[in-house]
Amino acid sequence: MAAGRNDPCPCGSGIKYKKCCFAKERSPSDPASLLWRRLNAVDEELARELLRFALKSLGKDFLDRSSDEFFGTSSVPIDVSSPEMQGLGPWMLYCRTIPVKDWLRDGPAKRGTIASAYLQRHASRLDAFSRRYLEACVEEPFSFYEVEDVTPGQGLEMEDVLRGERRYVSERSASGMLRPRQLVWGHVISLESLHLFAGMGSIPLEPIDKLEIVHLLAWLRKRHRLVTTAVLRREDASVRGT
């Protein structure tokens, strides 16, 4: 029987398989690594396309308007290469709801996101894989994730604190920086059994900060009883403001 990720490594080292031979056995050409690279390439290509679409359909000041809403102030300068764009960029493209009146052209018939409007108008431009990825980004809201375990250079075992779901997130750079019990505000999407960050806040939260998230969870449960994906999309402003 093949060893599970959390089982003792068959080599007899005494440590978990995922932190021993599992990492060594994963080559750059294995299916998971190939899929991870493909998803990241699609993410970068779609972000550029959606940004062009937004500039054309919403005007050049949509970046400033998005920044004002995201940070709650107009004093934060926009720099597309800044760490803050790790959170602002994906939220702006996939999660920010745009009023119908703001669209100059190619807008949806009702309030929607930049990505959902693009899918309505230009889905035929995308190959099937890119379309599924974009649909996953539109469907999934940002949430707070707590790091439970880390495999440096590979990924992180994480719990969605608000929905109570556990996922193994393939993330090479963040897995080298985050520690167990830290938390991140992130946009984790799932495609073909792989989970990865499509966006995250630039600053990790420490364990003491979890108290505020627990208070947010209690508030959400009081309003909705069950915290679902739809609830998190609807309460985006409250979650983001925590």
Where are these regions (language model features)?
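Acidic/negatively charged segments and metal-coordination signatures
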Residues: 1-157, 161-242
